[in-house]
Every structure is written in structure tokens, then in C-alpha cells.
Amino acid sequence: MSTGFLVEDVLHLATDEKQSKSVDSRISFGCGRVQTGSFLDGAAPNGLFGLGMDKTSVPSILANQGLIPNSFSMCFGSDGTGRISFGDKGSPGQGETPFSLRQTHPTYNITITQVSVGGNAVNFEFSAIFDSGTSFTYLNDPAYTQISETFNSLAKEKRETSTSDLPFEYCYVLSPNQTNFEYPVVNLTMKGGGPFFVNDPIVIVSSEPKGLYLYCLGVVKSDNVNIIGQNFMTGYNIVFDREKNVLGWKASDCYGVNNSSALPIPPKSSVPPATALNPEATAGGISPASAPPIGSHSLKLHPLTCALLVMTLIASFAIF
């Protein structure tokens, strides 16, 4: 639990048009002062940008003011850049799956019907929440065991078992002179048949005091809820359409989302993807269009500066 202050301020936005206009809106947001419970694990956030379905969230406020359609998108680039666009309802050709809404405390919950690891597909159904405020993906059984054990059986490098200081159970040792490696590709099939190719299911970390580099399957075992975190959303423009109650996704580098001219993001000002570990992360991944059973990675390492549950996103705020 987090306690602190709930305040109101003005959010300055720009319309996503050739002649962009400035739009100001009063919003509410919280600043956490005292953190307890799960917020003490890893790093305690100062606050989260409210994007949920509650009436006090930023998209709800903007929609209720008549400024936007009741929808928004978030784009997560493989180099750490990103964009959030309020009012975005997606684009033609995007994948879609319906939200499975609860009557109380609705979340962005979807249903997954198939998991494929390294080309080995298994049909079973489970629900998961798409949560951009969580850095990694959390799964309980049977999904966690199915994905992790299949990944482990196909990984070529030696597994590192002494990883008690890491949240990941399945990590593999890279040799000192190794500059690239291959790993089993993880793909999901959503309810309705839409494929969701996970571009970057791994995390590169440094192991001290051994001085080794490891790559880990970026999935943490959960005791209860399944969460698709930011790492599985990398390389996509993710649309949260609250009017149609569907989740949409389409491959994107996040620099030319919907050909927007509003507040462009300069490529050289990027920051690495969010993580909780002070490790290194790689840029790149496999193309969703090809989705081979084996992906490859080059060790292009950058220091990370952000913490679990604090999504570091170079965000261009736009209203559609």
C-alpha cells in the first residue's frame, strides 16, 4: 500500500494534427510518501501515472471532459523510447483481443489461448492483465512452468543456478568473449486468434562478484495474478480502447506512430528500458513478421537507470 497526497494540476497536451494546438486539462494524481507491502520489494515508486479504468484516471478525466475518445495508446520502442497518445483508437491491421472485465475494480484483463516457445505450441487458456506500470512479466502456474521449462530445455548456454539476488529463475551464463547468442522465441495467441510475438523476452544482467554476464528469461513466478509487463510489450504500439473494450497491438519503432507530427522524439535522446536490477539491457530483437523459433541477440550494452514499477518512458503526449 502507498499513502501520500492526492493533488490536482494542469496537464499540458498537444493535438496530433498538422497544425497542432495546445490543450490544457485539469487532472488529479497522487504522490506517494509512505510505502508498505509489495512496494518495499525492489524499489518503491514515488507514484504511478494513473491510466486505469477508474473515473479518476487521466484517460477517464480527458474523455469525460470531451477532449478525446475514451481510448489511448502506449508505444514501447526497443531502444527505450516511447510515446503515449490520448484518444488513439489504433490503426487498420492491428491485432485485437477483447478485455475480460470484472464487475468490481475492472482492469485491462485479456485471455491467452496458446503459448509457443521455440516453435513448440501448447493450447491452454489463462487470463492476464496488460500493465505498463510493471517492468517485467509475472505468471503463475501452469503458464509459468510451461514457458520457463520449455525455454530452459531449448537454451544453449549453461544455466546459472545461484541467482538468489535476482527475481528471475532461469538465467544462462555468457562466455567472456561472447558477442551474440541465440534464445528460444516466445509467442502468445490471444482470444480471437490474434498472434502476439514477444520481441524481447530476455534480460541481460551482470553477475557480481563473478564478473559474468547472464541472460535471463524475463518472467517472474507469481503466486496469484498473471501480469504482462512492459518487457513483453516492447516493439509494439499498444492500444487500450475503452469504448470497444478491446486491446490492440501493432509493431512499431515508436518514432513514427500513426505518422504523427506532434512533439516528435529525437532518436538520440533515448534511455534504456525499465528494469529493477541495475543490469544492462540490449537493444534490438527479432522481427514480429518472421517470428522464427530461435531469436538472436547482440551484446550492445547500456547502463540502466530506472527501477521496477517506475516506467522510464520518453513520452510524447498527444491528443487525437
Question: Which residues does each predicted region cover?
Answer:
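Long, low-complexity, charge-dense
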Residues: 180, 213, 290-320
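C-terminal GPI-anchoring signal of eukaryotic secretory precursors
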Residues: 260-261, 266-306
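Active-site or ligand-binding cleft "flap/edge" segments
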Residues: 1-275, 312, 318
